[in-house]
């Protein structure tokens, strides 16, 4: 654990277990691998063992965005004028209680391993730029982005040549990535050839898709328990749901063009591929949800009909009674004019 000061702002950083706290951490930034303009640059550092870490943050005392209005109504959280939670962090050494630190912020930073292959994917699809994740539903101009990128990635290059090319044509901070770390990333998303003992690499869309399929399979096998699943769905639909969710979890790490290439993947019968059928999973889940919506609509109509029928106190069905109006027919006797009848003379006044 260490405390850094950048631009007058103190940061509490939880370091990896294998990192020596006595050493200085030199961090650098790279563009977000998803090429989403609304996302900040990612902050990285590489330790002496060649492991690459990303510095991420977590803030206590701040609810999720979807419950912001409810939290305000319940007075659950309190914020400053800058919309920061009014909280402090206490760091205490359990072995020595006199050794402690008070941190006037509820935000802590932690380190997680980062795969440089995702930044290489972002470089390959550097023309596929999106404003936010909502743009991923639109597949327009994806083909043009792939075409324009492929023109500049047709050559096989050595690791050192790729290192120089990335530094000069993508971002200058690529110079902070070691050749060994870059080599491990290139091996995951590139085709390779060997000549005179030297290995040459060329990033291709096919290799990128294969790399991402491996990530999807790994997420499906170790599906996060925090993500709700379909409880009453058939087993095959549950599996499709996991594949769809695992694919969508990669949105924050890959450009839109790479995402749409992944959506169209479907293994052939003779390939012997064990990767999930992404395309079929999306189609089957969508068809199931559509059918389920129709069934729910029919079920709702039946429920409304049952509610209209109702039950009486004895548990018997009480059918709705129609109000019947009985019409009384009145017999109207015809009036006889005076002096016209045959018996009128008998009752004649004298």
Swiss-Prot record:
Keyword terms, alphabetized: Nucleus
Biological role: Non catalytic subunit of RNase H2, an endonuclease that specifically degrades the RNA of RNA:DNA hybrids. Participates in DNA replication, possibly by mediating the removal of lagging-strand Okazaki fragment RNA primers during DNA replication. Mediates the excision of single ribonucleotides from DNA:RNA duplexes.
PANTHER family, per the entry: RIBONUCLEASE H2 SUBUNIT B
The keyword Nucleus appears for this protein: yes
Extra facts: Present with 2340 molecules/cell in log phase SD medium.
The protein, known as: Ribonuclease H2 subunit B
Highest taxon of source: Eukaryota
BP term (GO), one: mismatch repair
Signal sequence region: none
Organism encoding this protein: Saccharomyces cerevisiae (strain ATCC 204508 / S288c) (Baker's yeast)
GO cellular component: nucleus; ribonuclease H2 complex
Family: Belongs to the RNase H2 subunit B family. Highly divergent.
Assembly description: The RNase 2 complex is a heterotrimer composed of the catalytic subunit RNH201 and of the non-catalytic subunits RNH202 and RNH203.
Major localisation: nucleus
Pfam families, alphabetized: RNase_H2-Ydr279, Ydr279_N
Ranges of Polar residues composition bias in the record: 134-151
